[in-house]
Amino acid sequence: MQTIEQQITDLIQETLSDMGFELVLVRVKGLSSKVVEILIDRLDDQKVTIEDCTKASNTISAILDVEDLIEEAYYLEVSSSGVERPLVKFENYKRFIGREVKIKLKELLNGRSRYQGTIIEAKDDKVYLKWEDQEVIINYDLIKSANLVLTEEMFKKLLGSENKSNTR
């Protein structure tokens, strides 16, 4: 049986893609009052705006209301996946080759359960990571969680694009 998160993913993924968004993550939290948290990114690599979140939220809300997956009242939160976005699909590692990532493992690899390094390659269900001047090969199914890391270079790039968008 599918989890509620997987059922929601199956319902909204294609529609969000048609709207130009990648569905990054679906989480359902809370016991007495449910919160459905949806993280999105834009397929064109532009920044997710408040308008994007509103548009996606309205669409998702309509779909969830029609399908009636969640019987009790819930809050819907749609937001950007952020600069330190989670990597939840193998394809994410391919997309972010050259970027720094923090990876937590399900079990030890070379005596470690965490790695932070640069993604060199992602192929054959393996992630190749440059870590402390070494190459580490991590089987995808060994990864518990992973997030991009905000580096100084990325921060400067973000500041540069903010300054450009704020000038008229």
From Swiss-Prot:
UniProt-listed InterPro entries: Ribosome_maturation_RimP (IPR003728), RimP_C (IPR028998), RimP_C_sf (IPR036847), RimP_N (IPR028989), RimP_N_sf (IPR035956)
Gene3D superfamilies membership: Ribosome maturation factor RimP, C-terminal domain, RimP-like superfamily, N-terminal
Subcellular location: Cytoplasm
GO BP terms, alphabetized: ribosomal small subunit assembly; translation
A GO CC annotation given for this chain: cytosol
Entry superkingdom: Bacteria
Stretches assigned to coiled coil: none
Keywords: Cytoplasm, Ribosome biogenesis
Keyword Cytoplasm attributed: yes
HAMAP family: RimP
Family classification: Belongs to the RimP family.
Known role: Required for maturation of 30S ribosomal subunits.
Protein name in UniProt: Ribosome maturation factor RimP
